[in-house]
């Protein structure tokens, strides 16, 4: 996907909007599935979704996942500048080694992460925590600082430094994977 450069102050604002929504939903135990699209096109997952071309805002993200909203059970897809689709159905991971700890949102996040390069953030309504799925791995209970750093790197990514961004993300994910899992 071609993307023009996003000024750093705008990347910081977008990061704050998404982090604010995730933190609100975490605190209020509102389940959510937010997909940060990268290079892999996700058009196949828009078929049953509501197509959007909306500015990324904390309030709109929260309202999409509000329990009485008909879109709340599906995923929200963002690119680096806009919210592009809501109510998306994602492929579920079907690996038998996946713990029963994971619910449908976590399985959907893992499933999409196995077939795309997307970063998928999951808010657990049962535990009130945010997890990240990337390349078939799930990092549970992200700390606020980790989530904010990840979002800022995502929104501020530049084509000319994409390789560096991916190396940093890979290193960050290795740290998450190496930390002991907490039930």
Regions found by a protein language model. Give the residues of each.
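Divalent-cation
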Residues: 1-183
């Amino acid at each position: 996907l071609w993307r023009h450069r996003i000024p750093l102050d705008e990347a910081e604002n977008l990061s704050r909007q998404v982090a604010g929504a995730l933190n609100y939903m975490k605190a209020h135990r509102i389940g959510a599935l937010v997909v940060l699209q990268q290079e892999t096109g996700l058009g196949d997952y828009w078929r049953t979704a509501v197509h959007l071309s909306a500015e990324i805002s904390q309030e709109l993200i929260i309202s999409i996942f509000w329990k009485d909203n008909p879109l709340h059970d599906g995923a929200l897809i963002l690119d680096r500048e806009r919210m592009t689709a809501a109510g998306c159905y994602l492929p579920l991971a079907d690996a038998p080694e996946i713990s029963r700890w994971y619910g449908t949102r976590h399985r959907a996040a893992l499933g999409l992460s196995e077939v795309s390069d997307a970063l998928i953030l999951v808010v657990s309504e049962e535990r009130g925590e945010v997890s990240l799925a990337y390349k078939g791995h799930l990092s549970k209970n992200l700390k606020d600082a980790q989530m904010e750093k990840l979002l800022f790197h995502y929104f501020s990514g530049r084509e000319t430094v994409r390789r560096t961004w991916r190396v940093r993300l890979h290193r960050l994910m290795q740290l998450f994977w190496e930390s002991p899992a907490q039930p």
